[in-house]
């Protein structure tokens, strides 16, 4: 479970894809897309596109890319299809869609939705490493991480180097051609915004409109800034509690309690026995700075989860950290099952860690996350093969394609400042920032309607976003029963 402290977040029947897709060369068949937690499944049309694992050796080993098309409900619509680019890195586009299908329902009225499980994820030659939940319990952390990484490489070999974003962007273009689409729209979430920017840089003529949700910008090497962004987000959450009358009344000393909690579990730890959230069986857990950091970061990801933080911090500071620990176990397990950690290693070790430059460790150590994530990444990347990366991957992006940027004010990993940085090179864009919200805005409030309207008109400035002024983040829990009535 501790490994995830640094890693890391409707049924409809269809007959056939619309004519634009039918003109392609990729054969599709009826299929169902299953929710990652097995709670539902959706109908689609699926196919497998065979591509070279190493693009420099077209006659070498091939892999199958899993592609799913959810046809537009209006079969006569000629709107461009929307390609979904998932986050992580390591999440499958099919998992993203099934989890948020309701948020895409308006778009799907007139747009095909295309789901390419990026190479190394989902059903496209997934690369999962067996990093055990308890690798930190050896108290010999980095050697245990090295051992698990070497075991993963023994399973997959040197070929993991061919699972970078630059190679995946070539796959995306091949899928577009194989489906017969002349032009497409892009929706990228979190790491998926990097993929969208990379594709847009090299295939702008094929893109009509772009939605970026939880924005990265090309010049950014993801890693060193993450603890600082997480600290900023947590400060905003605690400050929001201070100005919310019910929360402030329930937890008048929340900041002091939080500071005391950090001081206690910085150098120290507590051995807990709590009911396993999945089985109810007794679960032994060493609660220390790493578990606390994982809890705070994961709970900060969206305002609904963040609504629990004041109550959980209060309980933990009062000597009852079990509820906070249980939340961490549940969220970490869910993420662990959905992120292909080997693919994540291939991306981060090739595209981010080599570009870290100077890291102010003293500044990072002052945050609740500290430098543990960076140390773990560095250890993995000493061993992990480096793959092909475009020379302009980290160059500024300049584009005149209509682009809608979505940010949460309290996003712990991709704050609004990222979107503002990217926007400097976008000729036709609009940034929507939701107060109090965290990572990923597509399913928030009236945002599904706004995204659909943007993709139909491709004019971000003309959007009437007044509905967002009525939105409020989830109220804080002020007791075991929930928010104040």
Residue ranges and their predicted role:
Residues 23-291, 346-485:
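Gly/Pro-rich cap/lid or specificity-loop segments adjacent to the active site
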Residues 320-359:
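Long, low-complexity segments enriched in small/aliphatic residues
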Residues 1-7:
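Bacterial N-terminal signal peptides that target proteins for export
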Residues 275-294, 301-304, 334-342:
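Structural motif
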Residues 18-21:
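Sec/Tat signal peptide C-region and signal peptidase I cleavage site
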Residues 216-234, 312-317, 321-333:
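Flexible "cap/lid" loop of the alpha/beta hydrolase fold
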Residues 7-16:
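Bacterial N-terminal signal peptides
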Residues 300-314, 318, 354-359, 389:
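Short helix-capping/linker segments at secondary-structure and domain boundaries
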């Amino acid at each position: 479970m501790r490994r995830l402290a640094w890693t890391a977040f409707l049924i409809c029947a269809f007959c056939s894809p619309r004519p634009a897709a039918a003109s392609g060369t990729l054969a599709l068949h009826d299929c169902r897309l299953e929710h990652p937690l097995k709670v539902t499944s959706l109908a689609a049309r699926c196919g497998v596109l065979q591509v070279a694992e190493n693009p420099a050796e077209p006659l070498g080993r091939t892999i199958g890319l899993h592609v799913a098309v959810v046809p537009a409900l209006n079969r006569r619509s000629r709107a461009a299809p929307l390609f979904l680019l998932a986050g992580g890195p390591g999440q499958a586009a099919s998992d993203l869609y099934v989890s948020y299908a309701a948020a895409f329902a308006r778009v799907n009225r007139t747009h095909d939705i295309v789901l390419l499980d990026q190479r190394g994820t989902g059903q496209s030659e997934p690369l999962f490493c067996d990093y055990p939940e308890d690798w930190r319990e050896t108290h010999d952390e980095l050697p245990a991480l090295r051992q698990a990484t070497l075991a993963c490489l023994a399973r997959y070999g040197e070929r993991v180097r061919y699972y970078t974003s630059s190679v995946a962007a070539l796959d995306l273009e091949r899928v577009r051609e194989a489906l017969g689409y002349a032009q497409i729209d892009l929706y990228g979430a979190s790491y998926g915004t990097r993929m969208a920017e990379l594709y847009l840089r090299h295939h702008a003529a094929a893109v009509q409109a772009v939605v970026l949700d939880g924005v990265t910008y090309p010049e950014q090497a993801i890693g060193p800034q993450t603890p600082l962004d997480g600290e900023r987000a947590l400060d905003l959450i605690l400050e929001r509690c201070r100005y919310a009358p019910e929360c402030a009344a329930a937890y008048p000393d929340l900041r002091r309690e939080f500071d005391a909690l950090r001081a206690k579990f910085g150098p120290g730890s507590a051995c807990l026995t709590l009911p396993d959230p999945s089985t109810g069986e007794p679960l032994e857990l060493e609660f220390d700075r790493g578990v606390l950091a994982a809890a705070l970061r994961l709970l900060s990801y969206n305002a609904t989860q963040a609504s629990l933080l004041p109550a959980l911090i209060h309980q933990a500071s009062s000597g009852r950290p079990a509820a906070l620990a249980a939340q961490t176990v549940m969220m970490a397990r869910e993420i662990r099952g959905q992120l292909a950690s080997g693919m994540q290693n291939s991306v981060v070790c090739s595209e981010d860690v080599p570009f870290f430059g100077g890291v102010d460790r003293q500044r990072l150590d002052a945050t609740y996350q500290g430098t543990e994530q960076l140390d773990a990444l560095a250890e993995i990347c000493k061993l992990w093969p480096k793959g092909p990366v475009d020379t302009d991957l980290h160059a500024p992006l300049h584009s005149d394609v209509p682009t809608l940027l979505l940010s949460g004010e309290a996003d712990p990993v991709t704050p609004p400042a990222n979107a503002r940085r990217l926007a400097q090179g976008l000729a036709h864009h609009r940034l929507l920032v939701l107060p109090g919200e965290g990572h990923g805005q597509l399913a928030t409030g009236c945002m599904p309607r706004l995204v659909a309207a943007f993709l139909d008109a491709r004019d971000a400035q003309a959007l009437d976003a007044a509905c967002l002024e009525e939105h409020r983040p989830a109220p804080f829990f002020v007791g075991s029963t929930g928010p104040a009535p």
